[in-house]
């Protein structure tokens, strides 16, 4: 989330303190890598916006899947390696047998975007000149085709330059799309539309590792944030749908517990529990059961107000007009 300069120092100090455990001090790179599971690494970017976005890199024999791409805005611009692609191709990792994740870019990239916000798409330009293809929701592909990406991504609000993207290297996929490699071999990754945080949001199910990549649908330790097109009612319905889906998977005999890998701050959590708790928290905010902690001017809506709510590990920064819409909605807010 971009903030007003007057608030920057307090917000920066708070964010640095809350996320210090995610970042290793380095004289080489703005990324910190840890192994998430047998096939996947989590990269955390030390960015100047203090978003600390999480990028996931899943390794296959035929390709490298990258889920989100971070900000491409290093907090320390003097570091030798601040490009996501360069990190993946050149920085050796102890947890990867002292090899880079994709040495010299030998394998093609399949890039999956959870949604359009600047802290998830900023690293896309680093992949130009390499073999890559981008997969996103159909809604996001429409946003790009209609020349709304600079606005809807918040890059305009954050005074960031427009991204230059090759539309021929992008595919907007339907809900439930199964990803395959260049030889039409299933990668056991399913892409699901998941609106709420933003209208173009999607999540990724890794059926091999029983991991759900949630983007900004749910996480702990930092406020869930809503900007253009956010919808609390849709968000609750999305969380309920995902909770039901994963619960169904887990009821199969011998099935593993699903793990959540989030876009910020949280990974390795019990996915069903996180979805349940987030859904209940948002519903309780709408119903007035969680008091507003503070209010400030909404940087994305003239005359609007952002309200802040917290409970236990969860928090929310929500425009007041979205709360009014949800409280006045005739749609059932909780389907379970």
Curated annotation (Swiss-Prot):
**What pathway is it annotated to?**
Secondary metabolite biosynthesis
Q: What keywords would UniProt list here?
A: DNA-binding, Nucleus, Transcription, Transcription regulation
GO MF annotation list: DNA binding
* GO CC terms in record: nucleus
Residue range(s) of DNA binding per entry: 32-100
Q: Does the keyword Transit peptide apply?
A: no
Q: Which GO terms describe its biological process?
A: secondary metabolite biosynthetic process
Protein name, UniProt field: Putative transcription factor avaE
Gene, per the UniProt record = avaE
């Amino acid at each position: 989330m971009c903030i007003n300069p007057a608030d920057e120092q307090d917000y920066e100090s708070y964010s640095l303190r809350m996320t210090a455990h995610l970042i290793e001090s380095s004289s080489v790179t703005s990324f910190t890598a840890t192994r998430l599971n047998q096939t996947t690494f989590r990269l955390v970017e030390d960015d100047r916006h203090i978003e600390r976005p999480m990028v996931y890199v899943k390794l296959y024999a035929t390709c490298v899947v990258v889920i989100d791409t971070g900000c491409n805005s290093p907090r320390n611009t003097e570091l030798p390696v601040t490009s996501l692609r360069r990190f993946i191709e050149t920085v050796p990792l102890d947890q990867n047998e002292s090899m880079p994740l994709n040495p010299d870019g030998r394998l093609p990239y399949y890039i999956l975007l959870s949604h359009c916000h600047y802290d998830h798409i900023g690293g896309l330009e680093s992949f130009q000149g390499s073999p890559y293809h981008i997969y996103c929701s159909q809604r996001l592909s429409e946003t790009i085709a209609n020349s709304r990406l600079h606005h809807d991504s918040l890059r305009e609000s954050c005074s960031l330059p427009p991204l230059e993207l090759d539309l021929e290297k992008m595919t907007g996929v339907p809900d439930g799309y199964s990803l395959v490699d260049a030889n039409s071999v299933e990668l056991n990754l399913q892409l699901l539309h998941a609106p709420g945080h933003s209208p173009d949001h999607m999540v990724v199910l890794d059926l091999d590792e029983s991991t759900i990549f949630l983007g900004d649908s749910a996480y702990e330790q930092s406020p869930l944030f809503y900007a253009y097109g956010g919808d609390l009612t849709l968000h609750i319905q999305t969380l309920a749908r995902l909770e039901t889906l994963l619960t169904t998977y887990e009821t199969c005999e011998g099935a593993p517990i699903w793990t959540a890998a989030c876009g910020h701050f949280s990974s390795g959590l019990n996915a069903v529990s996180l979805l349940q708790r987030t859904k209940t928290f948002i519903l309780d905010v709408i119903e007035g059961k969680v008091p507003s902690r503070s209010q400030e001017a909404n940087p994305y809506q003239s005359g609007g107000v952002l309200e802040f709510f917290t409970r236990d590990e969860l928090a929310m920064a929500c425009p007041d007009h979205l709360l009014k819409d949800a409280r006045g909605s005739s749609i059932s807010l909780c389907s379970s």
